């Protein structure tokens, strides 16, 4: 995903933009938040990614999406009420940019297997570059937005 923070802010009610910046990928992993990356600081049960913001800045990330800014923070940021919700809003906005077919697989059992079968069929019919599928079992509120 590529874009600017100014483009994202419209789809994020209650958010505040500190400064605009361009980015060429979105990540929630501070270890991959390097040059050009937009880092979304998620709070988990064990770790709060807000604690890794200094590492993200040192790695050269372009900007961050956070729930709170550290004192003296200078990197461009979008401050939001909830970063997990914001990640979904970013993916939703990105998805709306493209009028391409989408296949969703739901159910209690077998989703990953069916997803892999569909991906293999599409790759055989149209080529690897013509399809996109989640890597492994990322069918959750974090994995799906990151796949888009």
Regions found by a protein language model. Give the residues of each.
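Phosphate-binding loop of NTP-binding sites
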Residues: 87-148
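N-terminal leader/targeting and accessory segments in enzymes
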Residues: 1-89, 93
């Amino acid at each position: 995903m590529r874009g600017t923070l100014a483009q994202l802010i419209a789809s994020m009610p209650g958010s505040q933009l500190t400064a605009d910046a361009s980015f060429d990928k979105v990540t929630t992993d501070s270890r991959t938040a390097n040059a050009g990356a937009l880092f979304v600081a998620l709070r988990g049960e064990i770790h709060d990614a807000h604690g890794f913001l200094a590492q993200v800045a040192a790695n050269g990330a372009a900007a961050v999406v956070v729930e709170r800014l550290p004192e003296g923070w200078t990197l461009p940021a979008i401050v939001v009420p909830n970063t997990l919700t914001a990640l979904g809003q970013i993916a939703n906005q990105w998805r709306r940019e493209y009028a391409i077919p989408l296949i969703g697989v739901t159910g209690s059992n077998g989703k990953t297997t069916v997803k892999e079968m569909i991906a293999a069929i599409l790759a055989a019919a149209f080529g690897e570059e013509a399809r996109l599928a989640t890597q492994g079992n990322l069918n959750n509120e974090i994995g799906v937005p990151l796949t888009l």
